[in-house]
Amino acid sequence: MAADLSGSPQALKVNNFSAKVGGAPLSASGTLRLTPSMRADLAIRGDGLDLEALTEGFPDLKGQIKGKANLVFDLSGTDKGNTGTGSLSAPSVEAFGLRLANVKLPLSLDGNAFKSSNGTLELYGGKASNSLTFDLKTFKFSDSLTASGVDVNALAQDATGGLGGKVTGQGSLS
């Protein structure tokens, strides 16, 4: 971890902050204002972040998400709460046994609610969109997924760990 800071006790400028997170570089820059009340405005960037390492500490997600992702997130925080927007993208991800491709998730933070609405991805030959909410206070999450044009057999095989038979056709799910 390395940090380059400048400024005064009232306002610190983060010229550059860098650390390894999940084996990949994560960087941040911005401003921390300490008086009259705490406020942070940070631009956070990460390339090639290991999703399995990053989700290891969350019981509901541990070992369930694998792949490398890129993160862009702009955070604004005050003593009244945090807000932010950004995106997470990945060429391929395995989530809960399912193989996803071309993942593009818009991100937002409002207090303890971390959300991804209208994310898109490719799923077994079809297209899918999602709406995810993660509560930072309780570490619980919910996700809804809508998909169309999906190869049902490939999805069923991966979702179940392998069926004894074969499912034919294409499907839509929500």
Where are these regions (language model features)?
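Extended lipid/amphipathic-ligand handling interfaces
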Residues: 1-10, 16-19, 25-38, 42-44, ...
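Gram-negative outer-membrane beta-barrel proteins
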Residues: 25, 50-54, 94-96, 140, ...
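Extracellular loop and loop/strand-boundary signature of outer-membrane beta-barrel proteins
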Residues: 56-61, 92, 154-160
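Outer-membrane beta-barrel translocator domains and adjoining extracellular loop/strand segments
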Residues: 58, 100-102
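Short flexible loop/turn segments that cap and initiate beta-strands
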Residues: 82-86
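Low-complexity, polar/charged sequence tracts that form flexible coils or short amphipathic helices
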Residues: 87, 98-99
